Amino acid sequence: MPVKCCFYRSPTAETMTWSENMDTLLANQAGLDAFRIFLKSEFSEENVEFWLACEDFKKTKNADKIASKAKMIYSEFIEADAPKEINIDFGTRDLISKNIAEPTLKCFDEAQKLIYCLMAKDSFPRFLKSEIYKKLVNSQQVPNHKKWLPFL
């Protein structure tokens, strides 16, 4: 039988942890959903979509799937006039373009880092000041609401 911890964590506390850093936000499904809604309102949801596609891509084991997923990411986010073209520098875009014929699991790493930094420095701080985030925090301030956190 699992032992329950004696500490409480309210939904508000969970929502507040998203403000600690972007990794905490991205690791939480509700936080990720809220961030995506915010980015969509700013017409920049392609950034988090690209980041998520890269995270999924890095888990790919099958060589054929690596090639097909890489081409899909390239055509959706990297190539000129892509439907969800991300804003990366020419050098990074050019390097990916040259390597896409024989992609590796690391072929998008540099672009993913650039997009992560862009979101962390620009979008994430604005999200924390947004009405979307404030409403989430305020709506979850329910008196005497307690949620047990299982230790095991």
Curated annotation (Swiss-Prot):
One of its GO terms (biological process) is negative regulation of signal transduction. GO terms for cellular component: plasma membrane. GO terms for molecular function: GTPase activity. The keyword Ubl conjugation does not apply. Pfam families: RGS (PF00615). Keywords: Signal transduction inhibitor. SMART domains: RGS. Residues 21-137 form the RGS domain. Expressed ubiquitously. InterPro entries: RGS, RGS_sf, RGS_subdom1/3, RGS_subdomain_2. The keyword Protease does not apply. Inhibits signal transduction by increasing the GTPase activity of G protein alpha subunits thereby driving them into their inactive GDP-bound form. PANTHER family: REGULATOR OF G PROTEIN SIGNALING, REGULATOR OF G-PROTEIN SIGNALING 21. This is Regulator of G-protein signaling 21.
